[in-house]
Structures are given as C-alpha cells and as structure tokens.
Amino acid sequence: MKMQTVVETIVANHGMTEKFWKAVETHDEFYLSVTNEPYMRLVIEVTSEGYVSVAHYYRQNGDAMRDPEVVFDPADWHAVEYTQDSLGIYQRIEPGYYSQGIETFAGIWARNIKAQGFCEVKPEVPAVS
C-alpha cells in the first residue's frame, strides 16, 4: 500500500478529489480532517508549495502535535519532509534526493492507516430529531 493510494482513497471517499487535485496544481488551500476513534485525527493538506501533507495530530498542553507528519511531492510521491513533534525530529529532504528510511516508514504507515479504517466509507449518522 502506498501513501498516494491512501490519500487518493480518503479524498475520494469525502467527495473532494477535484478540489484536492486543483489545490495541488494551483497551490491553493486544501484541508481535510478525518476523525476515526479511537485513533488520532488524520489530516491531509496541500501546502503553499503544492506538496501533500499527511499527519496524525493530538493535543499536548493546548498545542497541536504531529505524530508524525510526512510531506510528499505529488509529482512522484517521494517524501520531502518528516516531522515527529514529541521527539523533536524534523527532516527536510533536498530536491532530487530521497530518504530510504522515510520512504519505508511511509509505506508501513500507509498500510496502518488503511488497516485502521481511515480508507473506508463511513455511513452518514442520521441527525437526532
């Protein structure tokens, strides 16, 4: 399972495929937050550089903490950044290079995101009258 497949599936399941790819192309704002208890909230964003950020978030002392965040170049879906706030880790990969360790981690994380049910279409919960 690749992160590209996971992102595209989640975005499609939320009816946001066209908006997502337009944001990638034009570097416009795109934000999708997916709650799937008991797991941490998953956020997919498009950065001002046109990169795709995938992150799990939790709160610590009122601050949003990334656990982790991996930023991908959608041209080839190689990771360009890795952040793990709780450990104070930030890595930026130079253009034209890639990190085998981060790529391997991203593949494992993509499989975990799928296994945790983030890629499934959730039925709408009817409003209580």
Predicted regions and their residues:
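Helix-rich interaction surfaces within compact, conserved domain-sized segments
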Residues: 81-129
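Amphipathic protein-protein interaction modules
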Residues: 53-97
